[in-house]
Curated annotation (Swiss-Prot):
Pfam families: Serpin (PF00079). SMART domains: SERPIN. The lineage of its organism: Viruses, Varidnaviria, Bamfordvirae, Nucleocytoviricota, Pokkesviricetes. CDD domains: serpin (cd00172). This is Uncharacterized serpin-like protein FPV204. The keyword Transmembrane does not apply. Belongs to the serpin family. Poxviruses subfamily. Keywords: Protease inhibitor, Serine protease inhibitor. One of its GO terms (cellular component) is extracellular space. It comes from the Viruses. InterPro entries: Serpin_CS, Serpin_dom, Serpin_fam, Serpin_sf, Serpin_sf_1, Serpin_sf_2. PANTHER family: GH10112P-RELATED, SERINE PROTEASE INHIBITOR, SERPIN.
Length: 342
């Protein structure tokens, strides 16, 4: 299970997290497209065979921006077919640089232009012997979506992993019927916020206590993860309070991917489908993700006097963003909120 394997590599107790399993899968598939021999075999073992439509839906650009680029030193004479396939299949730009000192300027100019300044920069982790970097970036916002019938701003006490607590700004939604299920094997409640822009779902995975994510990450399996996203849940009338927040995170995936068995990519890899120059190597796998879980369309209303169960998202939790109607095991975004202020 690709997403779970990566989550287990990245998880750090008490620390926030945000990455795009779908985006990482895309750029690794893009690299695999130009690999042969053991390098390709190791990527085959890590990646799932499903190929997605990686094109951008212009109608959803107010919610999501997803871009990727492969930056290669000019001396490697990139295969023209690989460039074309990167563009048409994986929606990835292929650019060249002459000197490693150019990389930050080229990368940041590209990311500002392609994201319409929603993302302004990305760390490149360059070295004197950098030969190529593949980077992927995603911006996802819920600010302009009204997914609740009646909401108001609130403040809740959030209980952090380290035993402290802090007040956080929250959304308070009046009672509503949500897809909901309790998973006893991972001791978590799962609530689904659905049809964001009529295109996306968000799943909130809330452990029983503030340290429960340790047990969840240790014990969650691909089967359970798939059930969360694919099985029909019962609808339950709940009064929801959950934090509003923004998370921005950059990740260099070289070590996690190496740890997941793709050693050849970084040691004598066979990239003959990308370049015929034998010493070509992949020097960096970088991702930057930004999510805004905020709501512009908040009404100032008085609470309804309706009795029902409460669902307070007041401890560290996992959130997953998926496509509506495309329930699969490689989410668009997967993150952990730890209670940091907005």
């Amino acid at each position: 299970m690709f997403a779970i394997s990566v989550l287990k590599e990245l998880y750090d107790s008490g620390e926030p997290l945000l990455f795009s399993p779908r985006g990482l899968h895309k750029i690794l598939c893009n690299i695999r497209h130009g690999c042969n021999g053991n390098t390709k075999n190791q990527l085959d073992n890590l990646l799932e065979e499903t190929i997605y439509d990686y094109g951008e839906d212009q109608a959803l650009k107010h919610i999501i921006t997803n871009i990727s680029v492969l930056l290669i030193k000019r001396c490697y004479n990139i295969n023209e077919k690989f460039i074309k396939d990167s563009n048409t299949i994986y929606n990835t730009d292929v650019l060249e640089f002459y000197n490693v000192r150019q990389i930050p300027r080229i990368m940041n100019k590209w990311i500002r232009s392609r994201s319409n300044n929603k993302i302004t920069d990305i760390g490149c982790h360059i070295y004197d012997n950098t030969k190529s970097i593949i980077a992927e970036a995603m911006f996802f916002t819920m600010k302009h979506e009204s997914i609740f019938g009646s909401t108001r701003k609130d403040t809740i006490t959030f209980y952090k992993y380290d035993g402290t607590s802090l007040p956080v700004e929250a959304i308070h939604a009046d009672p509503y019927y949500y897809p909901y299920r309790y998973f006893d094997d991972i001791k978590c409640s799962v609530l689904q916020l659905w049809k964001l822009g009529y295109a996306f779902n968000m799943f909130i995975i809330l452990p029983d206590d503030e340290k429960g994510l340790d047990n969840l990450v240790d014990n969650i399996t691909g089967d359970v993860f798939s059930k969360i996203m694919t099985e029909q849940m019962d609808y339950k009338r709940l009064e929801l309070r959950m934090p509003v927040f923004s998370i921005s995170q950059e990740t260099n995936f070289c070590m996690p991917i190496f740890n997941l068995g793709c050693h050849s990519m970084f040691i004598d890899g066979d990239f003959s489908g990308i370049s015929e120059v034998s010493d070509f190597q992949l020097s960096g796998i970088i991702q930057k993700n930004i999510i805004e879980v905020q709501y512009d369309k908040v009404k100032t209303t008085k609470p309804l006097n309706v009795r029902c169960s409460s669902f307070y998202v007041n401890k560290p939790f996992i959130f997953i963003v998926t496509d509506v109607g495309n329930y699969d095991t490689i989410p668009i975004l997967l993150g952990i909120y730890q209670g940091s202020s907005k």
